[in-house]
C-alpha cells in the first residue's frame, strides 16, 4: 500500500478552488499592460485608486523616526496595542454616541481575521449562521472551518434589501448569528434604517423565544465610502 495522505481533503479542495475575483483581477492586470491601466475598469479586488492621505504618511514617518524599534516591531499585546484600542474606542464614541471603551476593542490583521474570530466565538459545530445573497464568497470558508454551517437567505430582487419572509422562515433555533454586509459586496446596496430596525426587532424577539442570544455580526469594510 502506498503512503496515505494526512492532509485534510476539505481544506485541500478549498485551496485548489478557483476564485473568480482573482481571475478577473489577473485579467485586468494583463489588459492594463496591453492597453494602459487608465483604459481598464477593474471591478475585481477592492484596491483603492486614490493616494494615502498625506497626514497618514507623515505620521508613519514621525513614528519611525521617534519610537523605539522594539515598540514598533516587537510583539504587541494579544488584544492589540492599548493606546490604539483607546483611540479607536474614543473615535467610535465620538462618531456614533455609544459608550465604547478599550475593553470593547479587539485588534485583528484585517476583517477576515476578525470575522473568523467572531464566528468561532459565538458558534459550536453544527450551529448555523445566516447571511444574505448576494454575499462575499469568502464567508463560506470562514464559517466552514469553525464547523458551523452558513445558510444563505435569497435576495429581494426588487431592491436587494432583506427578504424578510425568507429570513424569518430560515431563522430557526439552530441559528446563533446573522451576518450582514452594508454597503454590500457585490451589489453596492446600503440597508435602509427601516430594514436594520426590523432586523434588530426580529433578532430580539427570536433571542427571547429561543432562550439564547442571536448575535448580529456586521462586516463593514465599505462603511466610510457611502456617497449621497
Where are these regions (language model features)?
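Conserved core of the PLP fold type I
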Residues: 70-211, 217, 223-228
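N-terminal small-domain helix-loop-helix segment of the aminotransferase-like
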Residues: 7-110
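Short, internal active-site loops enriched in acidic
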Residues: 46-49, 221-225
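Short, Lys/Arg-enriched N-terminal segments with co-localized hydrophobic residues
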Residues: 1-5
Amino acid at each position: 500500500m502506498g503512503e496515505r495522505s494526512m492532509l485534510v481533503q476539505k481544506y485541500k479542495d478549498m485551496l485548489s478552488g478557483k476564485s473568480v475575483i482573482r481571475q478577473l483581477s489577473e485579467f485586468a492586470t494583463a489588459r492594463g499592460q496591453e492597453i494602459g491601466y487608465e483604459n481598464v475598469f477593474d471591478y475585481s479586488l477592492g484596491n483603492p485608486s486614490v493616494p494615502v492621505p498625506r497626514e497618514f504618511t507623515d505620521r508613519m514617518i514621525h513614528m519611525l523616526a521617534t519610537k523605539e524599534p522594539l515598540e514598533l516591531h516587537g510583539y504587541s499585546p494579544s488584544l492589540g496595542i492599548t493606546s490604539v484600542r483607546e483611540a479607536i474606542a474614543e473615535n467610535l464614541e465620538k462618531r456614533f454616541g455609544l459608550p465604547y471603551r478599550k475593553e470593547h476593542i479587539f485588534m485583528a490583521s484585517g476583517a477576515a481575521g476578525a470575522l473568523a474570530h467572531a464566528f468561532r466565538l459565538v458558534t459550536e459545530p453544527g450551529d448555523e449562521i445566516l447571511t444574505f445573497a448576494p454575499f462575499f464568497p469568502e464567508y463560506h470558508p470562514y464559517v466552514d472551518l469553525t464547523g458551523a454551517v452558513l445558510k444563505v437567505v435569497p435576495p429581494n430582487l426588487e431592491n436587494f434589501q432583506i427578504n424578510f419572509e425568507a429570513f424569518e422562515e430560515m431563522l430557526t433555533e439552530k441559528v446563533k448569528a446573522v451576518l450582514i454586509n452594508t454597503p454590500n459586496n457585490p451589489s453596492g446596496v446600503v440597508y435602509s434604517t427601516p430594514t436594520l430596525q426590523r432586523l434588530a426587532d426580529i433578532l430580539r424577539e427570536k433571542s427571547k423565544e429561543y432562550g439564547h442570544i442571536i448575535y448580529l455580526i456586521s462586516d463593514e469594510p465599505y462603511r466610510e465610502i457611502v456617497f449621497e
